Amino acid sequence: MAEASPQPGRYFCHCCSVEIVPRLPDYICPRCESGFIEELPEETRSAENGSAPSTASADQSRQQPFENVDQPLFTLPQGYGHFAFGIFDDSFEIPTFPPGAQADDSRDPESRREREQHSRHRYGARQPRARLTARRATGRHEGVPTLEGIIQQLVNGIITPATIPNLGLGPWGVLHSNPMDYAWGANGLDAIITQLLNQFENTGPPPADKEKIQALPTVPVTEEHVGSGLECPVCKDDYGLGEHVRQLPCNHLFHDGCIVPWLEQHDSCPVCRKSLTGQNTATDPPGLAGVSFSSSSSSSSSSPGNENPASSS
């Protein structure tokens, strides 16, 4: 009688990231038909008992693909679920259980530890690309918000970390303050930059005195101005012959409707930055006006060595 062909061992496909039974005799993955597979050692418990893992245990391992997870990113109160980083290579997903079924992690700690040991022994140091996974907490009471609802509320700024006692204890990405203080979405960073730039709108020289603004002379535009292509520095419109414009002490000309609103907010010429008093606001801020930095002359004049000797009679 011919001997039966040996049963293929347990293999792990690195392309599919799942445990498979290879297709013989080529030893390829039956799902992706790739040869990038690796034979897995027998389980310790199976070696001690002298039997292969049962079908029910294998089915249970396939139904619990999220045993091997790292420390949670951050935790929420009991019943809210928690985030964790898994070592799988697919996109973010939330595992669910069939109707009427429950995860037995809380009721059977021994079984959960066996699955964790089985997962560590099965994958070892082989850790494909990390992905963000989530596990639902069991035993959620009626009326407790779901994990999706909590995330949506955090994003919308409806609730703050003060209402969630255990929020913000993870190693990365911790919310330490109001969620509205963070940059959310694709336009969040642009909104923060715009807010920072708007803080500089009211900086600069103080408004000019109304008496000085009203005292600015009005001069007509001459042919020399028109021939040189002179234009208003504010609106960039060319001056017309005989048009009346306002002249600043720095001799720059402006339309009355262009320069008056500017001077009501900033006491400086838009071209040369000189104030109506002739001070250069770009190099000498108004707050430092009248402060003298010439200390060398005063120190030299007060030095005893520089005193003229008294003439002897």
UniProtKB/Swiss-Prot annotation:
PTM-bearing positions, type Phosphoserine: S5
GO biological process: cytoplasm protein quality control by the ubiquitin-proteasome system; negative regulation of epidermal growth factor receptor signaling pathway; positive regulation of double-strand break repair via homologous recombination; proteasome-mediated ubiquitin-dependent protein catabolic process; protein K27-linked ubiquitination; protein K29-linked ubiquitination; protein K48-linked ubiquitination; protein K63-linked ubiquitination
Chief localization: cytoplasm
Positions with biased composition (Low complexity): 292-313
Pfam families: zf-RING_2, Zn_ribbon_19
Chain intervals with Polar residues compositional bias: 47-64
Zinc finger motifs (RING-type), residue ranges: 232-273
SUPFAM superfamilies documented for this protein: RING/U-box
Residue spans of biased composition, Basic residues class: 118-128
Residues that coordinate or bind Zn(2+): C13, C16, C29, C32
Record GO cellular component, one term: cytosol
Subunit-level organization: Interacts with CCDC50, EGFR, FLT3 and SCAMP3. Interacts with BAG6 (via ubiquitin-like domain); required for BAG6-dependent ubiquitination of proteins mislocalized to the cytosol. Interacts with CDKN1A. Interacts with AICDA.
Free-text function comment from the UniProt entry: E3 ubiquitin-protein ligase that mediates ubiquitination oF target proteins. Depending on the associated E2 ligase, mediates 'Lys-27'-, 'Lys-29'-, 'Lys-48'- and/or 'Lys-63'-linked polyubiquitination of substrates. Part of a BAG6-dependent quality control process ensuring that proteins of the secretory pathway that are mislocalized to the cytosol are degraded by the proteasome. Probably acts by providing the ubiquitin ligase activity associated with the BAG6 complex and be responsible for ubiquitination of the hydrophobic mislocalized proteins and their targeting to the proteasome.
Domain notes: The C4-type zinc finger is required for interaction with BAG6.
Protein name: E3 ubiquitin-protein ligase RNF126
Organism: Bos taurus (Bovine)
Taxon lineage: Eukaryota, Metazoa, Chordata, Craniata, Vertebrata
Gene name of the encoded protein: RNF126
